Regions:
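Extended, charge-enriched "interface" segments that sit outside catalytic cores
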Residues: 2-148
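Core mixed alpha/beta domains of very large multi-subunit molecular machines
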Residues: 112-117, 121-191, 196, 200
């Protein structure tokens, strides 16, 4: 017997897309867990195709659905399914999300300093140096990657030859300047590298 939690998930799926749920119900009318998983599989396909109507917004949303299925299977007396293939899939999503590797970005602190000086002199829409434009484009690329694949795919930003906390602040300021709207600024985990003893 499916749990109330699983039935609520199914009802949510019906509200989201009657097309997906009617197809799953036709295949697995007497198997509610399988029907829910079929819709989840269709939503994963929609995520790959960037179908905004039914796609998963994040790997965490997919993980939450998986855990509902797992708990319901366990409560229904199917621990082998709950803690076998479903658990394996949960581990994979926890490890990789919707991607296989995490990207890291790295730039010298002096490049940031020069880019900020250039921006202060010419403004964001002025005649900027190629290196400044490249720095801004990097933050825009990070934002695009996060929107498409999730924050965990690209959030680490390494500053080489960091000498002070100001160099960390520079990164956040540049990230803000790269976007016209604050909500588009990507989340960043800035990692300063102090590569000279006197800077430690």
């Amino acid at each position: 017997k499916p749990s109330d939690e699983l039935l609520n998930l199914w009802n949510h799926q019906v509200e989201m897309s009657e097309v997906l749920t009617s197809r799953a119900d036709a295949i697995s009318a007497s198997e509610p867990h399988r029907a829910v998983m079929l819709v989840m599989a269709d939503r994963l396909d929609a995520t790959v195709r960037r179908n905004a109507d039914t796609m998963y917004r994040s790997a965490d949303d997919f993980l939450a659905d998986l855990r509902i299925v797992q708990r319901s299977l366990a409560d229904a007396g199917a621990p082998r399914a709950a803690y076998g293939p479903v658990q394996t899939l949960i581990w994979q999503v926890e490890t990789f999300g919707f991607h296989m590797v995490e990207m890291e970005f790295r730039q010298h602190s002096l490049v940031h300093t020069r880019a900020l000086a250039d921006l202060r002199e010419h403004g964001r829409h002025g005649d900027l140096a190629p290196m400044t434009r490249e720095v801004l484009d990097t933050f825009r690329a990070i934002g695009s990657i996060q929107k498409r694949y999730g924050e965990k795919m690209a959030h680490r930003y390494i500053i080489s030859f960091t000498k002070s906390a100001q160099h960390v602040a520079d990164v956040y300021e540049l990230a803000q300047l790269a976007f016209a709207h604050p909500e588009d600024v990507p989340a960043l985990d800035v990692i300063p590298l102090f590569e000279q003893l006197e800077d430690l």
